[in-house]
Swiss-Prot record:
Chief location category: secreted
GO molecular function terms attached to this record: serine-type endopeptidase inhibitor activity
Keywords annotated in UniProt: Disulfide bond, Protease inhibitor, Repeat, Secreted, Serine protease inhibitor, Signal
UniProt region (Pro-Pro-Arg motif necessary for proteolytic processing), positions on chain: 54-56
Signal peptide: 1-20
Compartment(s) of residence: Secreted
Name under which the protein is recorded: U-reduvitoxin-Pr12a
Upper classification of the organism: Eukaryota, Metazoa, Ecdysozoa, Arthropoda, Hexapoda
SS bond partners: C21-C38, C33-C53, C36-C47, C62-C77, C72-C91, C75-C86
A family per Pfam: Pacifastin_I
InterPro entries: Pacifastin_dom, Pacifastin_dom_sf
Tissue: Expressed by the venom gland.
Site entry (Reactive bond), positions: R88, K89
């Protein structure tokens, strides 16, 4: 399971790497809980690596046990249908 999570976050990081950031700025990593520095070319540089980021919990009403999207994050509804656990990806929307 840990290997699958690491692979997932690595793929997210690669996809996120193409987004521009402000050189010299500290930026939230794609997983939503680690931090990265922005290089002079606008790409992400070194990041902290807290391997397991806790999922965010949201209060809402949803269909028990069903997965759904919340912006760019993947969520799963709790068994009671009152909360959901979601990934913590940083969602960046491209300008039209």
């Amino acid at each position: 399971m840990k290997t699958a999570l690491l692979l997932f976050f690595a793929l997210v990081f690669i996809a996120f790497e193409t987004e521009a950031c402000r050189p010299g700025a500290l930026t939230v990593a794609p997983d939503g809980c680690n931090m990265c520095t922005c290089l002079s070319n606008g790409k992400l540089g070194r990041c902290t690596h807290d391997l397991i980021c806790p999922p965010r919990m949201f209060k809402l009403e949803c269909e028990p046990g069903k997965p759904f999207k919340n912006d760019c994050n993947d969520c799963i509804c709790s068994e009671d249908g009152l909360t959901a656990k979601c990934t913590r990806k940083l969602c960046i929307h491209k300008k039209p």
